[in-house]
């Protein structure tokens, strides 16, 4: 077999510098392209820790970012795979977050808010024209190109972005950030490009008064507010906002996505395209003061999550931040991205690996079996007479003395599989295992057992760490008409079902 040459293009062409940010499986560092001296931001993903699903998402993000070339979008310049790592080389944006810049300004008006949202709408319109839905528009993803006055707003982080055909509406999964989720996503209805416009409405509302339109300590009540479109323009802060600004917000925060304003339509709205004559130029000190508090809350939430990640308690952090609808939770986590889009696919992944394990058993392939099982596999099974079995030796006996010596065809069906996902790297599956085979006289036989298996993902691979099987223990003495290891007197579990 020919050897594969390992790519070292990133290592050869780029020099890495300080860390700019960190995620669960990635780190962002400043880098320089050695031949040109040009500086960039490198997102470095540890691919050894990624599941097949994560690899697909990485490929999707790179594909989308390569497609989008716009002054108001952080541009991807290079995408390089090396041994164990993938490098995404982006624009180096040095201006920080838009919302942090606003509170540092001496003067901030409605006209400034109009200019900000115009740039955001330009980026969203470019995405939509190219069949891309961002799905996670929020202040954290709105950056400034530099610290210079009048620097361009740049839309960042396309990790949740999806590709759509035209005005396609479909269920792409529950994804986004709680305070910015649209009613159709919360209703679990088909959705598409309009979800980004709803988020733009939330952002514009905050830009004008410094606090969000939807807010509640209880996440269930927050979601009820959003689904009902229950927001208003309270006095006195909204009294000084022009009717045209409120009109644009109303058009963006329209519950029915079919009637919601599009990005291209919003760019033609008088408050945007006739800013100099329509938008107020009055300084909004109250907005700046409220926005400072809003930013402080966001930073506190981010610091809490970072601490959880640093203490390697990421699963616990995600379980806290990803409560299901109806669970009481402070919206202090409302700037944290949620993604449940691939729950169905992840459950199918568990069913598939369970089927692979059973196939290894049926084939008497102990080598394949050990690759799928944790070396410290624990099990409760009838043959152990109520004792907890640990390790592979107990199972090795059946492979060496029955399974590998059997040449009879075996067919196994998994019935009614129920998968429980426990965080990102653990799952439990319960199912009925139906096994068909031919007995010594050539007659078809079927046996049934009820099984539960616990799976844990390590380095991107699922391993069975525990299982529990029902049934009666195999009787060691068998009638002569039945081949060794195939069935006991009562027709209960055969040796190939002991593992």
Swiss-Prot record:
Pfam families assigned to the protein according to its UniProt record, in alphabetical order: CaMKII_AD, Pkinase
Modifications the protein undergoes after translation, according to the UniProt entry: Autophosphorylation of Thr-287 following activation by Ca(2+)/calmodulin. Phosphorylation of Thr-287 locks the kinase into an activated state.
Occurrences of domain Protein kinase (ranges): 14-272
A single GO BP: protein phosphorylation
Chain intervals for the UniProt region annotation (Autoinhibitory domain): 283-292
Database matches in Gene3D superfamilies: 3.10.450.50, 6.10.140.620, Phosphorylase Kinase, domain 1, Transferase(Phosphotransferase) domain 1
Entry annotated with the keyword Acetylation: yes
EC number in record: 2.7.11.17
Residues modified to N-acetylalanine: 2
Modification type Phosphoserine: residues: 315, 319, 330, 333, 404, 490, 494
Active site (record annotation): 136
GO MF, one annotated term: calcium/calmodulin-dependent protein kinase activity
Residues modified as Phosphothreonine: 287, 306-307, 331, 336-337
Region (Calmodulin-binding) location: 291-301
Location in or out of the cell: Cell membrane, Sarcolemma; Sarcoplasmic reticulum membrane
Membrane topology of the entry: Peripheral membrane protein
Residues modified as N6-acetyllysine: 318
Domain of life: Eukaryota
Catalytic activity as recorded in UniProt: L-seryl-[protein] + ATP = O-phospho-L-seryl-[protein] + ADP + H(+); L-threonyl-[protein] + ATP = O-phospho-L-threonyl-[protein] + ADP + H(+)
Residues binding ATP, per UniProt: 20-28, 43
UniProt note on regulation of activity: Activated by Ca(2+)/calmodulin. Binding of calmodulin results in conformational change that relieves intrasteric autoinhibition and allows autophosphorylation of Thr-287 which turns the kinase in a constitutively active form and confers to the kinase a Ca(2+)-independent activity.
Any one GO CC term of the record: neuron projection
Assembly and interaction partners: CAMK2 is composed of 4 different chains: alpha (CAMK2A), beta (CAMK2B), gamma (CAMK2G), and delta (CAMK2D). The different isoforms assemble into homo- or heteromultimeric holoenzymes composed of 12 subunits with two hexameric rings stacked one on top of the other. Interacts with RRAD CACNB2.
Task of the protein: Calcium/calmodulin-dependent protein kinase involved in the regulation of Ca(2+) homeostatis and excitation-contraction coupling (ECC) in heart by targeting ion channels, transporters and accessory proteins involved in Ca(2+) influx into the myocyte, Ca(2+) release from the sarcoplasmic reticulum (SR), SR Ca(2+) uptake and Na(+) and K(+) channel transport. Targets also transcription factors and signaling molecules to regulate heart function. In its activated form, is involved in the pathogenesis of dilated cardiomyopathy and heart failure.
Domain observations: The CAMK2 protein kinases contain a unique C-terminal subunit association domain responsible for oligomerization.
Protein name: Calcium/calmodulin-dependent protein kinase type II subunit delta
Source organism: Sus scrofa (Pig)
């Amino acid at each position: 077999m020919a050897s594969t040459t390992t790519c070292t293009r990133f290592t050869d062409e780029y020099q890495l510098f300080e860390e700019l940010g960190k995620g669960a499986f990635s780190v962002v560092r400043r880098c320089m392209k050695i031949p040109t001296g040009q500086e960039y931001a490198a997102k470095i993903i540890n691919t050894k820790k990624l599941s097949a699903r994560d690899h697909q998402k990485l490929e999707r993000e790179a594909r989308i970012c390569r497609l989008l070339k716009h002054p108001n979008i952080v541009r991807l310049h290079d995408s390089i795979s090396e041994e164990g790592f993938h490098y995404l080389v982006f624009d180096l944006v040095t201006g920080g977050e838009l919302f942090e810049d606003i509170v540092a300004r001496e003067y901030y008006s409605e006209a400034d808010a109009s200019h900000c949202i115009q740039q955001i709408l330009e980026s969203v319109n470019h995405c939509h024209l190219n069949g891309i839905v961002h799905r996670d528009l929020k202040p954290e993803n709105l950056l400034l190109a530099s610290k210079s006055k009048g620097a361009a707003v740049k839309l960042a982080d396309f990790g949740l972005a999806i590709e759509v055909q035209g005005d396609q509406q479909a269920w792409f999964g529950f994804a986004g950030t709680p305070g910015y989720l649209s009613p159709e996503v919360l209703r679990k209805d088909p959705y598409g490009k309009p979800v980004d416009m709803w988020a733009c409405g939330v952002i514009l509302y905050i830009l004008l008064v410094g606090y969000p339109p939807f807010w509640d300590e209880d996440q269930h009540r927050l979601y009820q507010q959003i689904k009902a479109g229950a927001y208003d323009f309270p006095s006195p802060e909204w009294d000084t906002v022009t009717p045209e600004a409120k009109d644009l917000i109303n058009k963006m925060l329209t519950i029915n996505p079919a009637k919601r304003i599009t990005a291209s339509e919003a760019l033609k709205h008088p408050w945007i395209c006739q800013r100099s004559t329509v938008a107020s130029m009055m300084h909004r000190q109250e907005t700046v003061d409220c926005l400072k508090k809003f930013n402080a809350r966001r930073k506190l939430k981010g610091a809490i999550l970072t601490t959880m990640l640093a203490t390697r308690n990421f699963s616990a952090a995600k379980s806290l931040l990803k409560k299901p609808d109806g669970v009481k939770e402070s919206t202090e986590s409302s700037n944290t991205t949620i993604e449940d889009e691939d729950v169905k696919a992840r459950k199918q992944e568990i069913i598939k690996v369970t089927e692979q394990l059973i196939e290894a058993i049926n084939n008497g392939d102990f080598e394949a079996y050990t690759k799928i099982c944790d070396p410290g596999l624990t099990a409760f099974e009838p043959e152990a007479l109520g004792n907890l079995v640990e390790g592979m030796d107990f199972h090795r006996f059946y492979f060496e003395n029955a399974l590998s010596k059997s040449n009879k065809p075996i067919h196994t069906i998994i019935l009614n599989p129920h998968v429980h996902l426990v965080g990102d790297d653990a799952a439990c599956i319960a199912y009925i295992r139906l096994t068909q085979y031919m007995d010594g006289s050539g007659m078809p036989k079927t046996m049934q057992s009820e099984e539960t298996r616990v799976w844990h993902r390590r380095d991107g691979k699922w391993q069975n760490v525990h299982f529990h099987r029902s049934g009666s223990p195999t009787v060691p003495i068998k009638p002569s008409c039945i081949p060794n290891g195939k069935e006991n007197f009562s027709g209960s579990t055969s040796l190939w079902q002991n593992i």
